[in-house]
């Protein structure tokens, strides 16, 4: 999306001390795609896991420590609308500025992305393979970090997103 392009360009050009990636906890898997793109820039980053209250009301159980371990990042649960967790987020920003961490899981993912970039000639095929690999990675870590109720109710917005963001059905 245009927002993702602008975000990535800003981070590359301005070289911030730390990137605060605000992630919607209720739609964690969808948001991890951008998170992985930002991580590929190798900049210090913190995840502000916003709307954690909404995710909990939906019956989602997020293993924050496991998410931190998999991504090598501090993950701070917040409810921005009620100013909950914001002080902890500010403290994390101060302590994490300038620090990058890498995990074996992430390194393996980035190595596989590099392999695709080095071996696949067609730009379109390269992007498709990288996208597939990214979704596979998200799915693999999601099983360790996210538990959802079996009978989860989907909102109209969720159903629209499933079609619009589908790699085969989405409008290019």
Language-model features: where?
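Core structural elements
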Residues: 39, 133, 163-165
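Hydrophobic alpha-helical transmembrane segments
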Residues: 159-172
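Alpha-helical transmembrane helix bundles of large polytopic membrane transport and channel proteins
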Residues: 46-47, 56-151
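Acidic/polar residues at beta-strand termini and the immediately following turn/coil
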Residues: 24, 79-82, 166
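Conserved C-terminal guanine-recognition region of P-loop GTPase G domains, centered on the G4
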Residues: 2-76
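Pre-Walker A segment
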Residues: 148-162
């Amino acid at each position: 999306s245009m927002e993702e392009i602008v975000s990535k360009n800003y981070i590359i050009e301005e070289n911030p001390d730390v990137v605060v990636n605000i992630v919607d906890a209720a739609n964690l898997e969808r948001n991890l795609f951008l998170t992985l793109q930002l991580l590929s820039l190798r900049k210090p980053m913190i995840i502000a896991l916003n709307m954690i209250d909404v995710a909990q009301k939906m019956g989602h159980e997020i293993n924050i420590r496991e998410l931190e371990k998999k991504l090598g990042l501090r993950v701070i649960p917040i409810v921005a609308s009620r100013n909950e967790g914001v002080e902890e987020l500010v403290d994390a920003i101060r302590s994490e500025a300038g620090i990058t961490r890498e995990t074996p899981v992430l390194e393996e993912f980035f190595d596989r992305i590099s392999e695709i970039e080095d071996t696949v000639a067609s730009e379109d095929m390269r992007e498709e393979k990288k996208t597939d690999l990214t979704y596979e990675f998200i799915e693999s870590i999601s099983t360790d970090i996210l538990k959802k109720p079996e009978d989860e109710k989907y909102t109209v917005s969720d159903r629209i997103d499933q079609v619009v963001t589908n790699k085969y059905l989405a409008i290019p």
